[in-house]
């Protein structure tokens, strides 16, 4: 199974890139984690946020590989513990499809992305900076993988 992380924003701070890549490289080949960056729309004091969200959403959905299971990262989503996320990963594997996880920009995801999602995952009730979410998602997925494979990374 391939995990596809589709995120808005292309010029991340170095610590975000290093943090994401640290977990990305730990995944085995049979569960590769791929990052696809979508250019963020230009935001200014008079920006049309609805139009920007719409365009970002179109680009995100165009990046989803055909037939993938889509998971949006969104506040109304389901909170998963590490064991519950590990269980979700097992279900995704048994489903036989690759998984695309969608991370929006500063204003979140477009309505089209939310509607296209098969599932919605809420990392926290806190508002998190969208660059940091990349690192948290990569680590959480790696930890869930380690639970499923009895790797010593996760300890209870």
Swiss-Prot record:
It comes from the Bacteria. It is found in: Cytoplasm. GO terms for molecular function: rRNA (pseudouridine-N3-)-methyltransferase activity. GO terms for cellular component: cytoplasm. S-adenosyl-L-methionine binds at residues 73, 104, 123-128. Its main location: cytoplasm. InterPro entries: Alpha/beta_knot_MTases (IPR029028), RlmH-like (IPR003742), tRNA_m1G_MTases_N (IPR029026). It catalyses: pseudouridine(1915) in 23S rRNA + S-adenosyl-L-methionine = N(3)-methylpseudouridine(1915) in 23S rRNA + S-adenosyl-L-homocysteine + H(+). SUPFAM superfamilies: alpha/beta knot. Keywords: Cytoplasm, Methyltransferase, rRNA processing, S-adenosyl-L-methionine, Transferase. Transmembrane segments: none annotated. Its EC number is 2.1.1.177. PANTHER family: METHYLTRANSFERASE, RIBOSOMAL RNA LARGE SUBUNIT METHYLTRANSFERASE H. Specifically methylates the pseudouridine at position 1915 (m3Psi1915) in 23S rRNA. Homodimer. Belongs to the RNA methyltransferase RlmH family. This is Ribosomal RNA large subunit methyltransferase H. The gene is rlmH.
